[in-house]
From Swiss-Prot:
Region (Regulatory domain): 438-558
UniProt source species: Clostridium acetobutylicum (strain ATCC 824 / DSM 792 / JCM 1419 / IAM 19013 / LMG 5710 / NBRC 13948 / NRRL B-527 / VKM B-1787 / 2291 / W)
Origin: domain of life: Bacteria
Compartments (UniProt record): Cytoplasm
Name used for this protein in its record: 2-isopropylmalate synthase
EC class: transferase
A GO BP entry: L-leucine biosynthetic process
Gene Ontology molecular function, alphabetical: 2-isopropylmalate synthase activity; acetyl-CoA C-acetyltransferase activity; magnesium ion binding
Cellular component GO terms held in the UniProt record: cytoplasm
Pathways involved: Amino-acid biosynthesis; L-leucine biosynthesis; L-leucine from 3-methyl-2-oxobutanoate: step 1/4
Protein encoded by which gene: leuA
Family, per entry: Belongs to the alpha-IPM synthase/homocitrate synthase family. LeuA type 2 subfamily.
Length: 558
């Protein structure tokens, strides 16, 4: 690869940088640009109805600033702006934002679209990067700065017209391609714009510093932001905003570090929609904060519904591995991961943890409207813990610990044979085939139990008479023991159908619908190998005897 054709991005000279020692303690001002920056990047931009649906969803999520479009760019954008205002669809506590280039006719059209608005942010921009000055516009620094000043003057002029006297306007300026602009020049241009607007602590202006193209590592962007914050005159009268893109795949980190570096505000989209590789995903950054115990002041407790509405409006698809929102996020294919999750959830249920602490799960899926049933997925790489979790959580079977490896091998083999992931229903189907439906060579037809009380020895025993099918032929057996399980086991030995060693016995109630059944687990040892059997019935004795038959049948098949 021709790596020599690229030049390393320069470092920022910043003495005594402070951002590495800081933590995010509160949410920034969030501004959604889904309806503008996100919409312009769609193969098929949203129509007015889809935009209204998206706008209402953004309001429900909790955004207080929403960039709704570029009203001077098209009739659809203009019509949408007018509809929001005329139909009074903008809540009292929400401010819309519109974008315009620094050209007279575009600024005029923008303000016409805003007639009757209560509050609006007017966002004006021009590119300041060295590359675009030289290659695209062929203008020098003074000429580009002059464009910015004229844009600032125009939006100020129109905002002061009497027809807008009932509206409040906040001004925002972006030196587009800030990350490709010399820092001292970007500062010079922004201060020239602010000198026109003359913001105050009571009436602040917004300076937005976009990584229009992500060009370096997040720490470099943080250095740029801290440098800018420290050098900017009248800083207390300015809301410093970030607008990161994801060309290098690190825009979330850039925005997070930018907040540490002193920024007050963040622009982005849901799920990172935007030009090329996309914008900052505000949902991602907000839930990163949430996972650290910081209130993001945005509501994502119905994340599945948000994903569905987003996909319907944009015709885009949220990736299965997308942080927090993807279908596979709260899943675990690895056996060791599944086992750890199972133990973590059990510990949480028992109240042992004050805070959320579950291995491999950064947040509680329930907080986002997700379900625990989605967590464990079973394939050929899965382990014993995952299959045991599915059997307990989905079907109520609490498999003995020693049974986990055995059943895990059964499921692994089935998954290998089918070459696919197994659903809970398939897992239960294979469980029944392996443990409950195997009737060869033995099958219990009927039995009778008699209690024997030896008064002299103060000992109670049980006598059992049973009819079993052996390879399709009915045979009567009889045995005595300390209980039904022991008696039946001995009865099988008496007929030499057994020859096995009894290892363990477990049982528990099994609730299926409105009926309660008993399930029993028996482990035996035959020729130095151990086998489990399972029985289920309304009667615990029947369940226990069937568990023995199940174990014996499995031992004959191996």
């Amino acid at each position: 690869m021709l790596y020599n054709k690229y030049v390393k991005y320069p470092k920022v000279k910043l003495d005594n940088r402070e951002w590495p020692d800081k933590q995010i303690e509160k949410a920034p001002i969030w501004c959604s640009v889904d309806l503008r920056d996100g919409n312009q990047a769609l193969p098929k931009p949203m129509n007015v109805d889809e935009k209204i649906k998206m706008f209402k969803m953004l309001v429900d999520i909790g955004f207080k600033e929403i960039e709704i479009g570029f009203p001077s760019a098209s009739e659809t954008e203009y019509e949408f702006t007018r509809k929001l205002i005329e139909d009074k669809l903008i809540p009292e506590d929400v401010t819309i934002q519109v974008l315009t280039q620094a050209r007279e006719h575009l600024v005029k059209k923008t303000f016409e679209a805003l007639k009757g608005v209560k509050t609006a942010i007017v966002h004006v921009y021009n590119s300041t990067s060295e590359l675009q000055r030289r290659v695209v516009f062929k203008k020098d620094k003074d000429e580009v700065k002059s464009l910015a000043i004229k844009g600032a003057q125009m939006v100020k002029k129109y905002s002061e017209y009497t027809e807008y006297s009932e509206s409040k306007f906040v001004f925002e300026y972006s030196p587009e391609s800030f990350t490709g602009t010399e820092l001292d020049y970007a500062l010079e241009v922004c201060e020239a714009v602010l000198n026109v607007w003359k913001p105050s602590k009571e009436n602040k202006a917004i300076i937005n510093l976009p990584s229009t193209v992500e060009m370096a590592t997040p720490n470099i962007y943080a250095d740029q932001i801290e440098w800018f914050c420290k050098k900017l005159l009248n800083r207390e009268s300015v809301i410093l905003s970030l607008h990161t893109h994801n060309d290098r795949g690190t825009c979330t980190a850039s925005s997070e570090l930018g907040i540490l570096a002193g920024a007050d505000r963040v622009e982005g989209t849901l799920f990172g929609n935007g030009e090329r590789t996309g914008n900052l995903d505000i949902m991602n950054m907000a839930l990163n904060m949430y996972s650290q115990g910081v209130d993001p002041e945005l509501e994502f407790s119905n994340l599945n519904d948000i994903v569905e509405a987003y996909e319907e409006c944009t015709k885009m698809v949220v990736h299965e591995r997308h942080p927090y929102a993807g279908k596979l996020v709260f899943t675990a294919f690895s056996g060791s991961h599944q086992d750890a999750i199972r133990k973590g959830l059990k510990s949480l249920k028992e109240g042992k943890n004050k805070h959320w602490e579950v291995p491999y799960l950064a947040v509680d899926p329930h907080d986002l409207g997700r379900e625990y049933e989605e967590i464990i997925r079973i394939n050929s790489q899965s382990g014993k813990g995952g299959t045991a979790y599915i059997m307990e959580s989905d079907f109520g079977f609490i498999l003995p610990k020693a049974m986990h490896p055995e059943f895990g091998k059964v499921i692994k083999k089935k998954s290998d044979e089918l070459d696919c992931e197994l659903s809970p229903e398939q897992i239960f189907k294979f469980f029944k085939e392996e443990y409950l439906e195997n009737r060869s060579p033995y099958y219990l037809k009927n039995y009778k139990i008699h209690s024997i009380q030896n008064i002299e020895e103060e000992k109670n025993t049980v006598d059992i008479e049973a009819v079993i099918s052996v390879n399709g032929k009915d045979t009567s057996i009889e045995g005595v023991g300390n209980g039904p399980v022991d008696a039946f086991f001995n009865a099988m030995n008496n007929k030499k159908y057994n020859g096995c060693k009894f290892i363990s016995y477990d049982e528990h109630a099994l609730n299926i619908g409105s009926h309660s059944k008993a399930v029993a687990y028996v482990q035996i040892e035959s020729q130095d190998k151990k086998y489990f059997g399972v029985g289920i019935s309304d009667n615990i004795d029947t369940a226990s005897i069937n568990a023995i038959v199940s174990a014996l049948n499995r031992s004959k098949l191996k």
